[in-house]
Design a protein with these regions (language model features):
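Bacterial Sec-dependent N-terminal signal peptides
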Residues: 1-24
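Beta-strand-enriched cores of mature, soluble protein domains
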Residues: 22-173
Length: 173
């Protein structure tokens, strides 16, 4: 019994310490209608793409690879270029496409940031389409962009000029 009480006390102390260390407050009781999270606009990426090629039916769906050949990006506090060499890896099955784009960007002040953007494309009725993604950014921890490592982002892709893609990215506040 003493071991159980000791373990409970240690867990309580750890929880209090973690809450203080990471800025978590006590869980708040939810009342009334749920409140949607706020979004803050971060950046628009204009990505140029190469010729897509199909790997074929893998048993999980049809794998297509679309090379990322470059591009630019700009937002209120960040701008630069999309580096060539990444790709958008797509898996299509039953009218639904899962995407995973992996590439790097370089800011105009010389900081390289890794991007991994996962999302879903689903064709709807009457020509509608659901196309949303959740990019993750990995910036150097000693850079002014390190805040990007600690945030959740959502993006709304669109088709750009010349067969490219445009990604508008928001931070979830």
């Amino acid at each position: 019994m003493k071991k159980i009480l000791f373990a409970a006390a240690v867990m309580a102390l750890f929880t209090v310490n973690a809450n203080a260390q990471f800025g978590f407050g006590a869980p708040q009781q939810q009342s009334g209608e749920p409140k949607a999270p706020e979004l803050e606009y971060v950046v628009r990426l204009n990505v140029t793409l190469g010729q897509a090629f199909t790997v074929g039916d893998t048993g999980k769906g049809t794998r297509t690879v679309i090379p990322i050949t470059g591009g630019t990006f700009e937002g209120p506090d960040i701008k630069g270029e999309v580096l060539p060499g990444g790709a958008d890896y797509q898996m299509q099955c039953d009218g639904r496409t899962e995407i995973e784009a992996i590439y790097c960007i370089r800011t105009d002040d010389g900081v390289s940031i890794h991007v991994r953007n996962c999302g879903i494309i689903k064709m709807g009725g009457q020509g509608g389409m659901y196309f949303r993604c959740a990019p993750k950014f990995e910036a150097p921890k000693d850079s002014k962009y390190s805040w990007m490592n600690e945030c959740l982002f959502l993006c709304q892709p669109g088709f750009g000029a010349g067969g490219g893609i445009t990604l508008d990215v928001w931070k979830v506040k």
